[in-house]
From Swiss-Prot:
One of its GO terms (molecular function) is ATP binding. It catalyses: ATP + H2O + cellular proteinSide 1 = ADP + phosphate + cellular proteinSide 2. Part of the Sec protein translocase complex. Interacts with the SecYEG preprotein conducting channel. Has a central role in coupling the hydrolysis of ATP to the transfer of proteins into and across the cell membrane, serving both as a receptor for the preprotein-SecB complex and as an ATP-driven molecular motor driving the stepwise translocation of polypeptide chains across the membrane. GO terms for cellular component: cell envelope Sec protein transport complex; cytosol; plasma membrane. Monomer and homodimer. Part of the essential Sec protein translocation apparatus which comprises SecA, SecYEG and auxiliary proteins SecDF-YajC and YidC. It comes from Bordetella avium (strain 197N). The gene is secA2. This is Protein translocase subunit SecA 2.
């Protein structure tokens, strides 16, 4: 394999320089070289060769206790730092990490985990089924790189998983003499700076990127090494003391498809407050938007946008003819009204946001979790506050922004792991130069999938879910029900409570005791309703009686924007050879069908489904999957457009002498 020796962090803030292309031909040439480099990386059958080496090294370590592991770690670290990471030295490191896991955690890595770790150490995405122990797998490349002297970031989707994984794995790292800490968004800046000094840092993607943007603000886009070294020699409170990160050396991205693809549709923006008395304008915009009629605009739910018609523009010109600025400025007037219409029609309470303690809090659509320090721009956040009758916060002004695509390409080495990467293999390779390797399961899956059930209305769907839960609860089967929004989870909870069924709710508003709730979700007869919070990284342990009753039964109540998210929820069941069942109970009123309302097939399909002839439910299930696939294609186009815009911006900045 390519040695890591060239990646040693000699610079004060090591990271990969951005690729800048003078023209499309140069960009095409770079893409071809990337493709060839991915093809040169080892396929799985060749990757298996390391297993023999690891087992041979492990036999030599079998008698070591924790003190012996610690002493051997110093020897391995010296070799790695002198010679770089080669296949032979990596095998020795893996065997040592495996022995540390056995002694400190009571867990020795399986062969499939060794394969996954080796793939990631080479800069690949390891596709491992849910329940195969990705958290333990990540310790192999993380510890090996850290022993080699590289700062390591283990990145996952939320603070709950960050803290959980770091705490569980810390005894293993400490046995090797490595420091490990985690970073969460609610930590004070001084705490985060200290945490980033550790050998291995667990953090969420959002917290990490925002801290990187804060570093860019401190550096003011000036990363001149000589100047930074001079500042360090002078001592005192220079820029280096204000930085959070130690550069971008090696990242292991858990749930890589979610972080690198699903969440990569919009740039991350760090902003500052801007004192402005905009309450009057905000109220006027909402009042004017409410007065507009349907013919003045078109709502496009699938694209999450509103467009003005010519009739709408004419209405605004006439309504605002005598109004002062900003209403007298056409582009600003339309911008305000489009924001107001978007707030009225596309931002719904308990879906996109919740209200807590008199404040609007954004709900992450991918994780289902509250993001208390985040806000929407372009006046949208203030309009939502006005709509909810709350005190208006100060508008925000952009200080720095970056896309996930551009950020992660700055790492000297990038790797990832997920249970659902096959569908986006091409995108991961094209955008991040990340090959995907499929890792086999440790035990055969025993999960059973029932055919989809489709009902005409939402009410009929909830009724069917209620009856299914009643039947499963009577048999002692634990049930996990997935919903797409807080509102849907609360509505279903009321339906089940009215039927005297015991229900536990886990969503952005009910997240105080998440760990204990999840720990009880695998008990006999339990019923948990959850948003995406229980969809990724969540291990629901089964009691012996629940396993005997048939294992966890997962019910999907809506198709998500991506089939991968559905598969993640299904993956909570049947883990590590446990029994389990999954099924989808859906309706023709589900939000996913918004994407096909205006398609050529919408009319004929609606007619066929309304007739409810023989086989209509199977046809409806196919129509729902088609709508989901259509949404996936639309989102992929949006991401491609964003990458293109990013590249154009990068190239234009290179000619103007700017850029990160």
């Amino acid at each position: 394999m390519e040695s890591f020796s060239a990646l040693a962090p000699d610079p004060l803030y090591p990271e990969k320089e951005s690729e800048r292309h003078a023209n499309k031909l140069e960009a095409w040439g770079t893409a071809v070289l990337r493709w060839l480099s991915r093809k040169r990386r080892q396929p799985l059958w060749r990757t298996r060769r390391i297993l023999k080496q690891v087992h041979a090294e492990a036999a030599l370590l079998a008698g070591l206790d924790l003190a012996g592991v610690r002493a051997r770690a110093d020897e391995v670290a010296f070799e790695l730092r002198c010679d770089g990471i080669t296949q032979a030295s990596a095998a020795r490191a893996f065997a040592l990490v495996r022995q540390a896991g056995k002694l400190a955690l009571g867990k020795a890595h399986f062969d499939v985990q060794l394969l996954g770790g080796w793939a990631m150490l080479q800069g690949m995405v390891a596709e491992m089924n849910t329940g195969e122990g990705k958290t333990l797998t990540a310790t192999l490349p993380a510890a090996t790189a850290a022993l080699a002297g590289l700062p390591v970031h283990v990145i996952t989707t939320n603070d709950y998983l960050v803290e959980r994984d770091a705490q569980i794995m810390s005894p293993l790292y400490e046995a090797l003499g490595l420091t490990v800490r985690w970073v969460s968004m609610d930590m004070e800046p001084a705490q985060r700076r200290l945490a980033y000094q550790a050998d291995i840092v667990y953090c969420s993607n959002k917290t990490l990127v925002f801290d990187y943007l804060r570093d860019l603000i401190v550096l003011d886009d000036d990363k001149d090494e000589d100047r930074l070294r001079l500042e360090r020699l002078r001592g005192g409170s220079g820029r280096l003391s204000e930085l959070f990160l130690r550069g971008l050396c090696f990242a292991i991205v858990d749930e890589a498809d979610s972080v690198l693809v699903d969440e990569a549709r919009t740039p991350l923006i760090i902003s500052g407050s801007q004192k402005e008395d905009g309450g009057a304008v905000t109220g006027q915009a909402l009042a004017l938007a409410q007065a507009m009629q349907a013919g003045h605009y078109r709502v496009q739910p699938a694209a999450r946008r509103v467009v003005l018609t010519e009739a709408g523009r004419a209405y605004l010109r006439e309504a605002c003819a005598a109004w002062p600025a900003p209403w007298s400025i056409p582009f600003r007037r339309e911008e305000l009204i489009l924001s107001a219409l978007t707030v009225l029609h596309l931002y719904k309470r308990d879906e996109q946001y919740i209200v807590r303690d008199g404040k609007v809090m954004v709900v992450d659509e991918f994780t289902g979790r509250v993001m208390p320090d985040r806000s929407w721009g372009q006046g949208v956040h203030q309009m939502i506050e006005h709509k909810e009758g709350l005190e208006l916060s100060d508008p925000r002004v952009t200080l720095k922004s970056i896309s996930y695509q551009r950020f992660f390409k700055h790492y000297l080495r990038l790797a990832g792991m997920t249970g659902t990467a096959a569908e986006i293999r091409g995108e991961l390779g094209r955008v991040y130069n990340l090959p995907v390797v499929r890792i086999p399961t440790h035990r055969p899956s025993r999960r059973l999938h029932a055919p989809d059930s489709v009902y005409r209305t939402m009410a009929e769907k909830w009724s069917a879910v209620r009856e299914r839960c009643r039947e499963l609860h009577g048999r002692g089967v634990p049930v996990l029900i997935g919903t797409r929004s807080v509102a849907a989870s609360e509505e279903l909870a009321r339906v089940l409570a009215d039927a005297a069924l015991p229900v536990v709710l886990l969503n952005a508003k009910q997240d105080a005791d998440e760990a204990s709730l999840i720990a009880r979700a695998g008990e006999v007869g339990s019923i948990m309703i959850a948003t995406n919070m229980a969809g990724r990284g969540t291990d629901i342990p089964l009691s012996a009686a629940a396993r005997q009753a048939g294992g966890l039964h997962v019910i999907l109540t809506e198709r998500h924007e991506s089939a991968r998210i559905d598969r993640q929820l299904e993956g909570r069941s049947g883990r590590q050879g446990d029994p389990g069942h999954t099924e989808a109970i859906l309706s023709l009123e589900d939000a996913v069908l918004d994407s096909v309302k205006n398609s050529l097939w919408a009319g004929p399909m609606n007619t066929l489904l309304a007739a409810q002839g023989p086989g209509w439910r199977g046809l409806a299930a196919h129509w729902l999957r088609h709508a989901q696939a259509r949404t996936e294609r639309k989102l992929a186009r949006e991401r491609r457009a964003m990458v293109s815009a990013d590249e154009e911006l990068e190239n234009s900045l290179s000619f103007s002498g700017q850029g990160d």
